[in-house]
C-alpha cells in the first residue's frame, strides 16, 4: 500500500489517537488536491475520523516516519466525488507523522 521515505523512531498511533501530520494528496495523474506541507505547523486530526486508507497506513507508521501511500478508492472516498477528487479515484498521499496526542 505504500513505502517509507524517511524512518522515525517514535510511537505508533492507535485508531483513537489524534495525529499531527504534514501531507500532500494527489490523484494518479499527479494533480494535487490537498497540501499542508507549506504550513509552519502540522495539522492535528483524529485518526478515526479520516479515510480507512489513512487508518491502515498511520497505524503502521512511527512518529518521524514519512511515507508515500497509494489508497484504492474502496479505502478512500469510493463512489463519492469531492471537490477536486473524481469518484472511484485511487489516491496518493505523502504523509509525515510529526506527533501523537
Mark where each language-model region is:
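Cross-family detector of peptidyl-prolyl cis-trans isomerase
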Residues: 1-101
